[in-house]
Each structure stands twice: as structure tokens, then as C-alpha cells.
Amino acid sequence: MRRLTLFVLMVFAGTAAGRAQGTSQGTSQGTSQGTSDSDVTAKIVAMEHMWSQAYVLKDPKALERILDDNFVNVESDGKLMNKADMMAEVRASTILQVLTESMVVNLHGDTAIVTGIFLMKGVERGKPFAQRERFLDTWFCKDGQWVTIAGLVTPVGE
């Protein structure tokens, strides 16, 4: 089984208390009109957290609500994954913990760009692993609901 990569949080709004904070830059307008930047940021951070927890809890239904039907992710090995691929990956997850750091939410009207770093730990083929990656997620407010339309993960050093 291939090493699971989470872009998240994966990921990545933080599974540890106090790590589920993101900073906000930019302005929110359009369909998110009437909602403050901090409210939008908090909502997106919460959904990022839900996304990373989906891997720990093996809960693909969480991704059903978060990922757009046309979602695309570029994995750290260059592989492209769609929504169905991501949901299958969650069902087979061996991830035990996901932590995030340096998460920033940039708001641009009905679009939000989220960047950060996540560390995931788990067991693969009976051996423990730890993986640290930078992520970039693109969120879009579609019909009044924020969904992720694209993601990218890339390895980073310790």
C-alpha cells in the first residue's frame, strides 16, 4: 500500500488543541458577503481540521461534504487524485495523527487559498512512519457553501 499523503490538512487545521488557528489575509466578498473575514477563516479552518481528522477516523463521508465533485489534488509524487481517489484513500488510511503548523488563509472574494505544513504519523506495512509536507488548498464558495476545488502537497525537510 502506498504511503498516504494528505494535503489537508491535508490537511491540516491542527488536531492538537490550539493548532486549529489560521491567520487571515485578503477580503471576503461575493456570496460570502455579510460574513466577516474572521468568520470565513474560522469556517475554513474548521473544515481543514475535519478533513485531516477524516484520515485518522477513516471517515470518507467527511470528504463528501468538503471536496467539490470536480476536485483535483497533486500528490507529492506528482500523481493526480480526484474526489473518489481521496475518499478511497481515507477508507484505507493508516494515519494515526495529523498536526499542522503555519496555516494561513488568504481570502479573495469567493475563493480562499490555504497554505501550511502538516506532519502525519501512522503505520504502513507494520512499520511506523512520519511524513512532513507543505500543502496548498483552494476553496471556493459554491452556492453558499465552501468546498475545496484543488490541492497540492510537497515534501519539506525537518
Question: Where would I find each of the regions flagged by the language model?
Answer:
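Hydrophobic transmembrane signal anchors and adjacent membrane-proximal interface regions, especially
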Residues: 7-10, 80
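A beta-strand edge to alpha-helix "cap/lid" segment located at domain peripheries
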Residues: 21-158
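Bacterial N-terminal signal peptides that target proteins for export
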Residues: 1-6
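Hydrophobic h-region of N-terminal signal peptides that target proteins for export
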Residues: 10-18
